[in-house]
Amino acid sequence: MSGPCNTSAVDRTTELVRSLSSIVGADHVFADDDRRAGYESDWTGRYTGTCAAVARPADTDEVARLLEYCNNHAVGVVTQAGNTGLVGGGVPRPDADGPAIVLSLRRLDRIGGLDASSMHVTAGAGLTIAEWQRTARVGGFDTPVDFAARDSATVGGAIATNAGGSRVVRFGTMRQQVVGVEAVLADGTVVGSLSDLPKETVGLHWPSVLAGSEGTLAVITAARP
């Protein structure tokens, strides 16, 4: 029985890779063991799991299409960017029921110009904290959130974990720094906005909802920190 089962699993993975590649491009989907390995374990080595494939979208639209596909085909999704967490939240679960992919946000690393009047920028979820800092400092400002993993940790991850860091007592956590956020729900619906409005009277205030949600509610793709 092992032969047919293995063949079936290979066929499912092949079809999954083909479908994901049609969304983000073949160069940004891989299922081979060597390339997956760096995404299947956290940097401490304590938490590991196996994914069927890794997909690296370039923008919110591609994230939305990936999530819609996975939702429709019962494929689990693990969101990952800098992979600097210490509790295994960014790697596949070893006891997962069914196939899963790692959704890497590293390519969502664009940053807009600093708006001196609002003191905010538009940053992709995959932008590192260090790049956010550099942009702010060029404009004569600094970031209220800072921590040792700044060169690898990302804006999206910092929001999802509601990170604080060494300046948290003075400035608060990421929840206090973000005025706008763009995210994608599990079914591919894009929510939120990247406006500078401190309060919205229509619908949910997505920065407050998603800060600290650890990826359980939506995938953050961009923000206004």
Model-identified regions with their sequence ranges:
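FAD-binding subdomain of flavoenzyme oxidoreductases
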Residues: 110-225
